[in-house]
């Protein structure tokens, strides 16, 4: 699989969803394979580097390609091969659709996200009052 696109509807405002999913302090709460994520700066801007660590202390590094508040957040690995784009659409004051789209330029996706990951994101955010 070279690309993967999944969506989730979350019963929270677009502001809350965008802030939660772009803030590195929250990543480990909804992506089980990540133990820690840090960014050079937050909120990020184009060119900001993020890095995340798995349970075996392996670090992966990414750079921000697009950052449009409450609209889209796109990153790539430093080799510019793996990309991920989060897109956000408001469906009302307390309902947001988020699309997660990941792709590679060469080869196949190693560990594509599943709907379970976005379902966990939904559960975590909706329980966060």
Model-predicted segments: where are they?
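Beta-strand/loop substructures that line and gate deep hydrophobic ligand-binding cavities in soluble
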Residues: 74-128
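Intrinsic-disorder/low-complexity, polar/charged segments enriched in Ser/Thr/Lys/Arg/Asp/Glu/Gln
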Residues: 3-7, 49, 59, 72, ...
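Hydrophobic pocket/interface hotspot
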Residues: 17-21, 27, 52, 64, ...
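Hydrophobic ligand-binding cavity/cleft-lining segments
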Residues: 1-39
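Glycine-rich portal/gate segments that line the openings of hydrophobic small-molecule binding cavities
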Residues: 38-80, 116
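Generic structural detector for well-ordered beta-strands
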Residues: 7-11, 51, 63, 87-89
């Amino acid at each position: 699989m070279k690309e993967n696109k999944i969506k989730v509807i979350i019963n929270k405002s677009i502001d809350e969803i965008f802030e939660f999913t772009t803030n590195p302090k929250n990543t480990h709460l909804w992506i089980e394979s990540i133990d820690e994520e840090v960014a050079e700066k937050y909120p990020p801007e184009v060119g900001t580097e993020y890095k995340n660590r798995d349970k075996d202390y392996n670090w992966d590094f990414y750079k921000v390609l697009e950052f449009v508040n409450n609209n889209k957040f796109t990153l790539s690995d430093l080799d510019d091969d793996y990309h991920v784009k989060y897109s956000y659409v408001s469906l009302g004051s307390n309902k947001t659709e988020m699309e997660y789209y990941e792709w590679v330029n060469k080869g196949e996706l190693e560990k594509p996200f599943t709907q379970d990951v976005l379902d966990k994101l939904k559960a975590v955010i909706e329980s966060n009052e």
